[in-house]
Amino acid sequence: MSDHLTSYDVIVIGGGHAGCEAAEASARMGARTALVTHHFATIGAMSCNPAIGGLGKGHLVREVDALDGLMGRVADAGGIQFRVLNRRKGPAVRGPRAQADRKLYAAAMQAAIRETANLTVVEGEADQLIVADGQITGLRLADGRPLACGAIVITTGTFLRGLIHLGEKTWPAGRVGEAPALGLSQSLEAIGFRLGRLKTGTPPRLDGTTIDWSAVEMQPGDDPPEPFSVLTQTITTPQIQCGITRTTTATHDVIRANVHRSPMYSGQIKSTGPRYCPSVEDKIVRFGDRDGHQIFLEPEGLDDTTVYPNGISTSLPEEVQLALLPTIPGLERVRMIRPGYAIEYDHVDPRELEPTLQTKRMRGLFLAGQINGTTGYEEAAAQGLVAGLNAALTAGGGEPIVFDRADGYVGVMIDDLVTRGITEPYRMFTSRAEYRLTLRADNADQRLTDKGIALGCVGGDRARFHRTKMDALEAARSLARSVTITPNEAAKYGLTLNRDGQRRSAFELMAYPEIGFSEVRGIWPELGTIGPAIAVHLEIDAKYDVYVRRQSEDVDAFRRDEGLVLGDIDYALVPGLSNEARAKLTAARPWTIGQAGRIDGMTPAALGILAAYLRREARRSKAMV
C-alpha cells in the first residue's frame, strides 16, 4: 500500500470481492489507486456463503486468475475443502469449487491488498460523486474529505440503501452489523440514473458443536485437492468434511403455518430475489410436492465452530427459524448463533453500461458487482477486474479493453448484462455460453493470459510461468502427433480401431472415449517425459479437438460481427431502419453489430442495413483522407 494522498488516478468504492479485484487491477496497471471502505478489517469479508467457485462460477475464478487477479490465489490460501463439481461429465461443464475458512480468506485478501504497490486504502464512507462537464472528477466522503480522481469504480454490493428484513422487523444496513450507503444512491439519482431494487438472503448460522454429525451424511473433498490458481503448486491448509441433511415434512409444516410472516409473502418485500438461490419458504411454496430439500452443512473455519446451512436461506421471524431447525435430521438440538435474514438494495440497470463497464451517462464512472444486478462473489470479482483495468486505462488516456463472448465467461456475463439487462439477480451458468467447448475452466490461462500480458496486467512471475507451461504443452502436442500406429499394431495393445490401414497418432487415439493418456503412454514410453499436469491438458485437447475446430468457424463468424463497431452512430441518420429498430438501437446503444443482433426483436434486415451503412461510412472516410 502507498502513503495517503488526496488525488488519485482511480478511486474504488467498496472493499468486497468486486472492489478488491478492481483496486488491485487498477494499481497493477500503474494507476495511483484508492480503495475507499468503511473499515480495513472488513476487506475480503464473505458476507454470505463461505465458498468460492462452482458450476460456471469456477470458470470465472479461473479467468480472474488467468488475468493475474486475486480471487483464485486467495481461495487457495483459505480453502478447507476443494471439489470439482460435475467431474463425471465433460471438462467443459466441470466446476472447481472450494469451501473456505472465512478468517483465512479475509486475511489472505487483506495481505494481498496491503502488499499492492500504488494502492492506498482510505477508511471512510463514500457520500457524493463530484462531477464537472459530464466527467467524474472526484469523490466526497461523508466526513467532508474530498478526493480528486480521473475515474471511479463503484462496487457497493448490498450496501446501496440496504434494508434488512427479519420477519416483520426491518432496519437499514449494508449487511448485518454494518451501516448502509445512503448518499451514493442520492448522488447517482442526481446524475440521472434510475435505481431499481433487488433482494437476496442468507440462512441462519449454527453452532457446529450442537449438531449431531452422526445423523447426517458426510461429504469429503477431492484428494488431492485441485487449486484454482495455476501458480498454486499444492494446497497446504488442513482439509475438512461437510455434512448433508434434508428438510422434512415437519419442516414444511412449520414454514407453511408461518409463510404469511415471511417478508416475501406478506408484501413487505416487493423486489426480486435470485431465481437459482431461493429462500426455503420459496422452495416450499413453489415445490410443494417435494418431501424434502437438500441442505449442506458447511463449517465456516478450522478454528470456528460456526456452520453455514446452505439451502435454508430465510427471512422468517427468529422464533419461526428456531422452531423449524429441530425438525431437520442432525439439528434436533442445534443452537442458532444468528438468524437468517433478507436484504434489499439499490441497483443500476446494466444496460446503462458499455462493455467496458463504464457508464454511458457519465464518463469516468464504472460499476461492478451487485450494483449491476448480479449475484455471487465470482460474478462480482470478474466484473471488478474488468472495471478496474478499464478505469486505469481511461484515467491514463488509453484505449479500453473489451472481453467478448468468445474470450471467456467474463465476456458472456458482461454482454448479457449490457445487452439484455436483468429482471432478477444474474447468476453465471455454463449454459449461458454458446462457445463452452472452448471456454473451459481448464484452459482459462491458455485463452486469456497472453491477452493480459499484452495489456500489461500480468506480472512477471505469472508471465514466465505461462510461457514455460505453453512451451511444454506445445512440445507435448508435437510429440503426441509425431508417434503413429496402424490398426493391426494397436490391436496388440488391446485397442480396437477401424481396420482401414490408416496410421493414427497418439493425439488422434486420445480422441476415442475409451483411450486416455495412460493408454497411449503404454504404447510409446517416450510420452512418459510429459509431466502429469501437461498430460491432463493434452488429453482434454485431444478429446475436444474435432469439436473445437468445428466451433472455431462459428467463433470466426461471431468475431466478424463483433469487429463492426457502431460507436456513437446517430441512428436517425441511418436510412432504411424501421422506427422500431431505430428506437431500440437508440435506447440500447450497442457497441458492435454483433451486440445489436442480441437485442430482443432486432431483425436480420436491420442488421444488414447497419452493416451497409458502416461500410459506406468507412469508404467515405477513406476517400476523404
Curated annotation (Swiss-Prot):
SMART domains recorded: GIDA_assoc_3
Cofactor section: FAD
Keyword Membrane in annotation: no
Main location: cytoplasm
UniProt-annotated binding residues for FAD: 14-19
One cellular component term from this protein's GO annotations in UniProt: cytosol
Keyword Cytoplasm part of the UniProt annotation: yes
Cysteines engaged in disulfide bonds, as pairs: none
GO biological process assignments: tRNA methylation; tRNA wobble uridine modification
Pfam family, one: GIDA_C_1st
Alphabetical keyword list: Cytoplasm, FAD, Flavoprotein, NAD, tRNA processing
GO molecular function: flavin adenine dinucleotide binding
Record's subcellular location: Cytoplasm
InterPro entries: FAD/NAD-bd_sf, GIDA_C_N, MnmG, MnmG-rel, MnmG-rel_CS, MnmG_C, MnmG_C_subdom, MnmG_C_subdom_sf
Family assignment from sequence similarity: Belongs to the MnmG family.
Function: NAD-binding protein involved in the addition of a carboxymethylaminomethyl (cmnm) group at the wobble position (U34) of certain tRNAs, forming tRNA-cmnm(5)s(2)U34.
Protein name: tRNA uridine 5-carboxymethylaminomethyl modification enzyme MnmG
Species classification: Bacteria, Pseudomonadati, Pseudomonadota, Alphaproteobacteria, Hyphomicrobiales
